[in-house]
């Protein structure tokens, strides 16, 4: 799923500490180290479905909402329940991105389908270069209070993207990128508090910041039980829009 203050990543003991002297020279080396920091290629490959539960807080929202996020490769459904009882459901079935609110259903026709597929790639840590025209190591820089390897690239759909990996731990600290919708806005996404729930390490606090608006998802549980394809079927209200 992208705070106005410097972020501190809380790392579990399972995250290896790499010697700073062994400076990495290529984007592939940085990404390979990230895969190992998460728990290794085999652990990442085992994730074929995912259910995440937690809370979300955002600018303009008086209290925290709760959410359930379910995903399989290239599909997802996100259900958010606000403190006032209002429910919002968003999803992607591999082709169509949609949202249903109390005001009705709508289809996202602005975001590139490849961007949506990237966001629902459960093995994205293994496939990152596949989504870029180019992705290169731009150097070492400070990002949100961390000394980071900085990767810079352009996606296949023409968006600028910057990734920051902690020099000490190899873990992803955050992104700074051009939004995937039609807006030219630059967004920042931070990944904090890494934990394992029986699979690869997961950032359990994910904060997205665009301008003066902030949204933070806090994960309380992550499970990898299989999910039926029916979970990701289009709601009837969305199907009506396609007729």
Predicted regions and their residues:
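Sec-dependent signal peptide recognition
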Residues: 2-9
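Acidic/charged, solvent-exposed loop-and-adjacent secondary-structure segments enriched in E/D, K/R, S/T
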Residues: 98-124
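A short, sequence-level motif marking secondary-structure junctions
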Residues: 68-73, 93-96, 112-116, 166-168, ...
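Gly/Pro-enriched, hydrophobic low-complexity segments
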Residues: 19, 81-83, 144-238
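Short, conserved active-site entrance elements at the starts or edges of catalytic domains
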Residues: 115-150, 171-176
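Short, solvent-exposed mixed-charge patches
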Residues: 242-243
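N-terminal mature ectodomain segment of secretory-pathway/periplasmic proteins
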Residues: 22, 29-105, 131-137
């Amino acid at each position: 799923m992208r705070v106005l203050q410097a972020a501190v990543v809380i790392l579990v003991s399972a995250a290896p500490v790499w010697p700073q002297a062994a400076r990495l020279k290529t984007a592939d080396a940085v990404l390979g180290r990230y895969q190992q920091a998460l728990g290794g290629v085999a652990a990442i490959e085992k994730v074929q479905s995912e259910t995440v539960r937690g809370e979300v807080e955002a600018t303009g929202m008086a209290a925290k909402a709760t959410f359930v996020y379910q995903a399989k490769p290239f599909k997802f459904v996100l259900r958010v329940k606000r403190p006032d009882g209002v429910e919002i459901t968003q999803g992607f079935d591999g082709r169509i991105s949609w949202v249903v609110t109390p005001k009705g259903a709508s289809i996202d026709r602005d975001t590139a389908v490849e961007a949506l597929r990237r966001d629902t790639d459960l093995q994205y840590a293994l496939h990152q270069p596949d989504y870029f025209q180019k992705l290169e190591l731009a150097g070492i820089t400070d990002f949100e209070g961390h000394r980071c390897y900085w990767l810079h690239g352009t996606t296949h759909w023409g968006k600028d993207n910057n990734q920051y990996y902690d020099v000490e731990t190899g873990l992803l600290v955050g992104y700074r990128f051009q939004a995937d919708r039609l807006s030219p806005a630059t967004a920042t996404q931070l990944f904090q508090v890494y934990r394992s729930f029986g699979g690869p390490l997961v950032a359990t606090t994910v904060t997205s910041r665009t301008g003066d608006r902030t949204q933070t998802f806090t994960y309380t549980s992550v499970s990898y039980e299989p999910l039926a394809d029916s979970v990701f079927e289009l709601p009837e209200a969305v199907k009506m829009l396609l007729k």
